[in-house]
Amino acid sequence: MIRLVFALRRKPGSSREEFQDYWLNKHAPIVASVSSDLDILRYVQTHTLTDPANAAAQNARGSMEPEYDGVAELWWASEAALTANLQNEAAQKAGAVLLEDEAKFIDLPNSPLWFAYEYPQINPSPEDVFAKVKSNIVRVFFPLRHQGQISE
């Protein structure tokens, strides 16, 4: 499987709470409505907590990227399936619908995205465990910056 990872920052002038509410309650249903046109197999939103633990984790690691307000992840069956799907007109229209809505609440120039393969290192069982507000499941993201002394 291949996935899109989209590290999101809210548009200036909106609070994190407003951003996350819109993303979950307005944008997510739009993604769901076009998911079959885009052949999306899975869509996950990870909402950043406003918690002192975030600052502590960042301070322990030195200079880090400014905090993101959340991370969106979308999965497709394969790179070939994704590439083929993006050639069809319905997928192109669906992508335009998503981009139009994203421009309403996401600071797009400051919200990087990339396609990636995942390599699970620890995989909980059962796999149908979902994080919910006030659950004991918390996900941690460490966007890594390439160090100049390490070759690509």
Q: Whereabouts are the PLM-identified features?
A:
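Macromolecular interaction modules
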Residues: M1-E152
